[in-house]
Amino acid sequence: MFLTFSMCVNWIIVKMPNRSEELDRLLDKIINSPHRTEASKTLQEIENNQSYILNVQLKKLLRLHDDSFKNKCVSPINYMLEKYTPYMGHTEALQKEAELVDRDLRIIEMTYQLIKKNRNSK
């Protein structure tokens, strides 16, 4: 009968409950064996892949994300800033115009109220 690694681990867990230290020792012995086992080969491949992912792929992904963010957000805002900066000085004039219109509306409302009051009193 051929036993796989997972079958061995399951057997160890079932036969030796509450012996996590011994299980850790056996797993460490299997994985760090000086003889090239499938488990040690797989572990080595995982470590190599992790190094490649962190050192190469993650940097490329960050660069791609930075470029995408810059093209979608920063560049349009800079364009709008350059386009509308000349109009920024006009906001003070607009504020003054709005204040004058507001004042005129209040005067008209007061005049209307006075006219209405005079009509009702006659």
Swiss-Prot record:
State its location(s): Endosome
* GO terms under cellular component: endosome
Q: Does the keyword Transcription regulation apply?
A: no
The superkingdom of the source organism is Eukaryota
Coiled-coil region(s) at which residues? none
Principal subcellular localisation of the protein: other
Q: Which residues carry this modification: Phosphoserine?
A: S33
Free-text function comment from the UniProt entry:
Component of the biogenesis of lysosome-related organelles complex-1 (BLOC-1), a complex involved in endosomal cargo sorting.
Task: Please give the subunit comment from the record.
Answer: Component of the biogenesis of lysosome-related organelles complex-1 (BLOC-1) composed of at least BLI1, BLS1, CNL1, KXD1, SNN1 and VAB2.
Say which family it is in.
Answer: Belongs to the BLOC1S1 family.
The entry's protein name is Biogenesis of lysosome-related organelles complex 1 subunit BLS1
What is the scientific name of the source organism?
A: Saccharomyces cerevisiae (strain YJM789)
Instruction: Specify the taxonomic lineage.
Output: Eukaryota, Fungi, Dikarya, Ascomycota, Saccharomycotina
